[in-house]
């Protein structure tokens, strides 16, 4: 069995064509929505995305799990969806951003190395990182967590895009090299990606 859980950032519920938007066309998401389970009456627990994500991951309110803001650590030892699914024998991977940071103070107090398996899982809400939001394979503070190359970058290299990180250089940047578009601040978000 596979579970694909997609959590968007900065997306209104009615900005998908499967939700009836008259102009925005989202055929791939519509296809997934048609075949899967749609949470059409879901409500966030916090106006900040990081805190709301932690509520989804833990099943608890922000006042209980303690994450009140983005980039605020989830305490070491807090069980998440990833921890529970892993106990059931499932591989649990995270792709993208979470606004999550490790509980460095708690890990230091318990003698946990940030680049250990438990340290990396702690910094990724109990999941194993697969590919970061910038297209790179996840790295711990002391080096690579996963030795295999980034699948995004390898696919772009096969298409002729050069460099160590073609995802950053071509897909996640503006037309000129000095105008890098990042996250929801992208100045070029209304233009197609710089990929052939």
Region locations from a protein language model:
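Formylglycine-dependent sulfatase
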Residues: 1-196
